[in-house]
């Protein structure tokens, strides 16, 4: 199951302001705390953070909300985070802070046929493996190796890197994209 957390709603409830700008570190920390509480109270395995009602996302809030939420990894247990409703300028802010922390997240663009996009620090092999999974939905390491003409160890390392960053789900052998719909 997927839990959708509307960041715009959290912002309005947290700062009691009509503005749709997510700026300042204290505001970002307050929003992150609300997200963490919502995730902790949910039985869902995937949280979709919906930024569609946010107009401005500055670097400090991208760091506080997204990077620090991902750094909180062990406390998330088996839960995953996916971003949605981002505009290009917001993608850039999040990409910058995640790359700095060597973190990554999957983002779902809007549109009729959205394909997930990786934001942050991911190796070239990881990006190629993610693109392969986007086309097929699921794969064994041996299938990825055959599909990309890679040695088995290279395919396994790329998929394990994606799983480590919680960008894909694995049952031990098969890797798949996170459910977001």
What is each residue range found by the language model?
Residues 1-24:
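Domain-start "cap" segments at the beginnings of catalytic or binding domains
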Residues 40-41, 133-137:
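Short helix-capping/hinge SLiMs at alpha-helix to coil transitions
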Residues 48, 135-148:
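Short acidic, hydrophobic short linear motifs in intrinsically disordered regions
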Residues 100-132, 157:
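Short alpha-helical segments that sit at the start of domains
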Residues 123, 170-181:
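Short, cationic-aromatic polyanion-contact patches
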Residues 149-164:
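Short amphipathic alpha-helical interaction segments
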């Amino acid at each position: 199951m997927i839990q959708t957390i509307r960041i715009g709603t959290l912002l309005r409830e947290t700062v009691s302001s009509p503005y749709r700008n997510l700026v300042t570190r204290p505001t970002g920390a307050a929003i992150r705390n609300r997200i963490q509480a919502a995730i902790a109270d949910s039985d869902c395995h995937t949280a979709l953070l919906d930024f569609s009602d946010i107009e401005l996302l500055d670097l400090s809030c991208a760091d506080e909300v997204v990077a620090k939420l991902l750094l909180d990894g062990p406390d998330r247990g088996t839960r995953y985070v996916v971003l949605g409703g981002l505009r290009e300028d917001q993608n850039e802010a999040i990409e910058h802070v995640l790359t700095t922390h060597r973190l990554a997240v999957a983002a779902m663009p809007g549109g009729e046929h959205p394909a997930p996009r990786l934001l942050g620090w991911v190796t070239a092999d990881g990006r190629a493996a993610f693109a392969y999974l986007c086309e097929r939905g699921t794969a064994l390491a041996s299938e990825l190796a055959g599909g990309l003409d890679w040695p088995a160890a290279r395919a396994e390392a790329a998929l394990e890197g994606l799983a480590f960053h919680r960008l894909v789900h694995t049952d031990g052998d098969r890797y798949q994209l996170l459910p977001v719909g």
